[in-house]
């Protein structure tokens, strides 16, 4: 039997059975879930009603993630799935769905921050820098350019929780697109109260 999104196969509110008045219709069809996994990109196209296309992501490993407080969006690697409010099974199988909490690579965001503010981010005291990083952070600048960076630095404060994550090289993020519908895993970096909430949830899950 095909997957059907009708309600005439259900019993009535009073408990009585319904006689099927017609066969299943094309407009009532449903399709199996894509269960998008972590891995090299694999996307299938599905022809849907009206001749339109849906992009069914079967495997994904990168996505566009937005760092809201800094208005910065970067393409970055998805490392792992760590939490899902609806089902722990989806965490175990590393399934990417909307609103699941994942770990993403922090390198693109750190590069942007260091070039934008000329300040180190998530680096240990006295850590060795590569020549390129040294050039970005400790370059001699003209007075005009230095003034511009000083003005920017007034807003360069980062929460201790985020700084801790940058030191580990991984950021907690949330997927806000629907990988099984649009074929992409895009989302945003968790910050503030939302980050605290999910850290508590993840810690509680580990403690079990």
Curated annotation (Swiss-Prot):
What ranges does the record give for the region Disordered, renumbered to this chain?
1-40
GO annotation (BP), single:
translation
Q: Which organism is it from?
A: Ictalurus punctatus (Channel catfish)
Question: Which UniProt keywords are listed?
Answer: Cytoplasm, Ribonucleoprotein, Ribosomal protein
Q: What is its main location?
A: cytoplasm
Keyword Ribonucleoprotein recorded: yes
* Compositionally biased residues, Basic residues: 8-26
A Pfam family reported for this protein in Swiss-Prot or TrEMBL = Ribosomal_S8e
Does the keyword section mention Cytoplasm? yes
Q: How does it assemble?
A: Component of the small ribosomal subunit.
Residue span of the signal peptide, if any?
Answer: none
Name the record gives this protein: Small ribosomal subunit protein eS8
Compartments in which it is found: Cytoplasm
The terms describing its cellular component in GO are:
cytoplasm; ribonucleoprotein complex; ribosome
Described function: Component of the small ribosomal subunit. The ribosome is a large ribonucleoprotein complex responsible for the synthesis of proteins in the cell.
A GO molecular function for this record? Answer: structural constituent of ribosome
Q: Which family does it belong to?
A: Belongs to the eukaryotic ribosomal protein eS8 family.
